[in-house]
Amino acid sequence: IKDILGILLLMLFLMLLVLFAPDLLGDPDNYTPANPLNTPPHIKPEWYFLFAYAILRSIPNKLGGVLALVSSILILILMPFLHTSKQRSMMFRPFSQCLFWILVADLLTLTWIGGQPVEYPFIIIGQLASVLYFFIILVLMPITSTIENNLLKW
């Protein structure tokens, strides 16, 4: 009974919020008049695609940016096939651990840059982080796996 009461109170609160104050949690930038010739600066994707959006914006060419965006997402799908190490766990592979945390820091940087405006320092940081993203996944991870295989005599 007390669980049903809690659910009903939560539903009541949400219904009151939606019906009587729908703009309370909204963004005021959404009410500016639209110009169909350009994208407003406050438009950005959800937080989980901001890293790909930063990669898209880091390339000045539109086609190149779209190809980089698609490849940045597809590369995450292909990641298991790029894993060439004989040992599956990273517990005894310190180079791979370090590389993993560098990749996490790079993804966090790209996510932060994706939410920033297109201005001078953010453009350069986004370009460097984009190059580092592809370099880590396509070059450093396979090389590190090969080195660790040789060190472990697999």
From Swiss-Prot:
Q: Entry's InterPro entries?
A: Cyt_b/b6_C, Cyt_b/b6_C_sf, Cytb/b6-like_sf, Cytochrome_b_C_euk/bac
Bilayer-spanning residue ranges: 1-21, 63-83, 95-115, 122-142
Keywords annotated in UniProt: Electron transport, Heme, Iron, Membrane, Metal-binding, Mitochondrion, Mitochondrion inner membrane, Respiratory chain, Transmembrane, Transmembrane helix, Transport, Ubiquinone
What biological processes does GO assign it?
mitochondrial electron transport, ubiquinol to cytochrome c
**Chief location of this protein within or outside the cell:** mitochondrion
State the GO CC annotations. Answer: mitochondrial inner membrane
Compartments in which it is found: Mitochondrion inner membrane
- Name one matching Pfam family: Cytochrom_B_C
The prosthetic group or cofactor this protein requires is: heme
In terms of SUPFAM superfamilies, this protein maps to: a domain/subunit of cytochrome bc1 complex (Ubiquinol-cytochrome c reductase)
Q: Which GO terms describe its molecular function?
A: metal ion binding; ubiquinol-cytochrome-c reductase activity
Family to which this protein belongs? Belongs to the cytochrome b family.
This chain's function reads: Component of the ubiquinol-cytochrome c reductase complex (complex III or cytochrome b-c1 complex) that is part of the mitochondrial respiratory chain. The b-c1 complex mediates electron transfer from ubiquinol to cytochrome c. Contributes to the generation of a proton gradient across the mitochondrial membrane that is then used for ATP synthesis.
Q: What else is known?
A: Heme 1 (or BL or b562) is low-potential and absorbs at about 562 nm, and heme 2 (or BH or b566) is high-potential and absorbs at about 566 nm.
What is said about its interaction partners and assembly?
A: The cytochrome bc1 complex contains 11 subunits: 3 respiratory subunits (MT-CYB, CYC1 and UQCRFS1), 2 core proteins (UQCRC1 and UQCRC2) and 6 low-molecular weight proteins (UQCRH/QCR6, UQCRB/QCR7, UQCRQ/QCR8, UQCR10/QCR9, UQCR11/QCR10 and a cleavage product of UQCRFS1). This cytochrome bc1 complex then forms a dimer.
Q: What is this protein called?
A: Cytochrome b
Species whose genome carries this gene = Cervus nippon pseudaxis
Name the gene that codes for it: MT-CYB
